[in-house]
Amino acid sequence: EDYERLKSHVLALCFDTGTLGTGRLWHFHPVAFITHFRRCCWLSKSELKQIVPRNLLRMAGQNDYRWEAIIYRDGVGSLADNIRTHINRAMQKHLITTPLRLACFLGNGIQETGWLGTMEEGYRYTERDPRTHQIVRRYNIWYYPWYGRGLLQLTSPLNYFEYFSFRGRVYPVNIKDTLINEYNRLYSHRGIRYTDNHLSDTENHIPENIISWRDNVSSDNHEATSSAGFYWASRNMAYYADNEHILERCSVNTRRNGVKIYYRSQAFWQASAAVNLPAQIDNEQYQGLNGFNERCCAYGSAIAVLT
């Protein structure tokens, strides 16, 4: 009797698809199985590689567009190879689990990290003599050492300390306030950024643990992606990513490479501006956001692969 009940139960779960032929029986239809597991949006190595575009559209100046090849390295031990699992975990944790959310998240993160080539901003500059082209000096960007780090380039004392709080870390409030005030002072007075700058760790007696927290955002892959998740959550990027994505086909004349096409949408602009340019979220002219054309190249690839 028990066997007959078990057999009836098993038969109820099985079905002959008919369409696949050879008389096979399936406990779960393979197409339904694949469809269900695709919803988790866990990217394989090959899927992530497909999202990285082969070329970028860079604006070198006003109406000066360059069509340039992207060098993407994802060999064993590379940054792209090592960080992929951490990116997937961060996306699962923060519910970046729909194709359009992934497109908005990765469209920004892939571009900001130089196509998954580095987790920190290029903060070191070189000044050359305009006549001889000899190196005059090398210097750090004015907001050093609080320059961009991580998958979405956490930048400035305010954002770092907000991230530390997001992670439940405790720090002296007076140090945070001093650094934020100094950053704001320099931001408002361009002429003194390099002549009257007081953001250094030494001058502000920054504790070693805070320095480690900050530096780990670029050196630790978990921190690099966790900080991006913080941006996603705290800047409400999902709200904009979930809006309707009405794609605009953009055609531009490039130098030496003729006409090239890329796609953009107001939803992607708003999700990007929420982190990088909050005051311009509703700007329908797509102006003011650094590298937006390049971001659109990654966004378009993600849309093509994931939807």
Language-model segments: which ranges?
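A structural motif
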Residues: 144-210
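Glycine-centered flexibility motif
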Residues: 148-150, 215, 235-236, 291
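Cell-wall glycan-active module
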Residues: 1-136, 169-171, 175-176, 192, ...
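Active-site rim elements
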Residues: 211-219
